[in-house]
């Protein structure tokens, strides 16, 4: 379980988050909703460790991770897909997926079949450059890359923004599948 308790986050003198609480249970989908500029992305950046908080606590599976760097949080099973997807445009789909190997033990360095079951288009495009994919295909690639790490918590920022409806349905089905399997 993820527990965010009374966190504050500042960018210089500007306060982005004030007293935020959030809990997310295993096997559940938790959504953070709000208009532009209210701190949704800042909250996600704090959860994954990209932005330090000035007050409060972030716990994952009963462990205080507030001061852990992002790579340690990733090792604990937290994966993040940012709003801009941040795929590598000059690398192939295969190479993009393999960038997730960096934090894995040698025996775990493979792309799980589940990635291609959820997003079959990726298998068909393994040799294509990431930058040649549509926005929706890039989002599928970003989610697939995160799934290579076999996360227990998947943090998605605006996962369907600017994507065609058919791919939104594919992403929704993938999220439902991951929820039902419990992580």
Question: Predicted regions span which residues?
Answer:
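Catalytic Walker B motif of ABC-type/P-loop ATPase nucleotide-binding domains
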Residues: 154-158
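Helix-to-loop junction immediately C-terminal to a conserved catalytic motif
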Residues: 48
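ABC-type ATPase nucleotide-binding domains, specifically the catalytic core motifs of the NBD
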Residues: 12, 52, 68, 93-110, ...
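The feature captures the beta-strand-to-loop junction immediately N-terminal to the Walker
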Residues: 33-35
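A short, proline-enriched helix->beta-strand linker immediately N-terminal to the Walker B motif
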Residues: 148-152
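ABC ATPase signature
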Residues: 91, 133, 146-147
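Conserved ABC transporter NBD signature motif
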Residues: 56-63, 76, 108-111, 117
